[in-house]
């Protein structure tokens, strides 16, 4: 049992360090003024001006669409409260869920800015990324309380 606890702590520390390093590398990017659609179905997604790890619009830039607006709000929240703030991540998920409902109500007529990266691909990708972000945040926050 003690070995398992030690292994869990090591795994949590390892993943937290990897997450922090990845975010640090990604955050070194400059802000963007153009709507980008890249890697739409991977965790290295770049969507709009604000969606994607470390991907952010320049101050005063308007989001490219409704999903990008959710990402902009999330970026602002973690900037104020820290990257491991789970309430920021949950707020983002609620924003994306509202958008998903609006898309369904429009019978899929509500579309994003990109035909290359349609909402049907991008939304599941950002949801998966946020689930992973929440997991890392929980692990990181657990480690802080143990120290």
UniProtKB/Swiss-Prot annotation:
Belongs to the phospholipase A2 family. Gene3D superfamilies: Phospholipase A2 domain (1.20.90.10). The lineage of its organism: Eukaryota, Viridiplantae, Streptophyta, Embryophyta, Tracheophyta. Inhibited by aristolochic acid. It comes from Arabidopsis thaliana (Mouse-ear cress). PA2 catalyzes the calcium-dependent hydrolysis of the 2-acyl groups in 3-sn-phosphoglycerides. Releases lysophospholipids (LPLs) and free fatty acids (FFAs) from membrane phospholipids in response to hormones and other external stimuli. Regulates the process of cell elongation and plays important roles in shoot gravitropism by mediating auxin-induced cell elongation. Involved in stomatal opening in response to light. Plays a role in pollen development and germination and tube growth. Disulfide bonds join 31-58, 35-64, 40-117, 51-71, 70-95, 77-88. It is found in: Secreted; Endoplasmic reticulum. This is Phospholipase A2-beta. It catalyses: a 1,2-diacyl-sn-glycero-3-phosphocholine + H2O = a 1-acyl-sn-glycero-3-phosphocholine + a fatty acid + H(+). Ubiquitous but expressed at a low level. Detected in vascular tissues and in the guard cells. Predominantly detected in pollen.
């Amino acid at each position: 049992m003690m070995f398992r606890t030690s292994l869990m702590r090591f795994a949590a520390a390892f993943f937290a360090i990897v997450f922090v390093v990845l975010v640090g590398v990604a955050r070194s990017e400059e802000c963007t003024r153009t709507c980008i659609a890249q890697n739409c179905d991977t965790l290295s997604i770049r969507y709009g001006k604000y969606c994607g790890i470390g991907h952010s619009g320049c101050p005063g830039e308007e989001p490219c669409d409704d999903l990008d607006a959710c990402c902009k709000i999330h970026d602002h929240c973690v900037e104020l409260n820290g990257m491991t703030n789970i309430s920021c991540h949950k707020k983002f998920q609620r924003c994306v869920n509202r958008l998903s409902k609006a898309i369904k109500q429009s019978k899929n007529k509500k579309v994003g800015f990109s035909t290359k990266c349609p909402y049907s691909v991008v939304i599941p990708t950002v949801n998966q990324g946020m689930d992973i972000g929440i997991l890392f945040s929980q692990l990181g926050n657990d480690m802080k309380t143990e120290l």
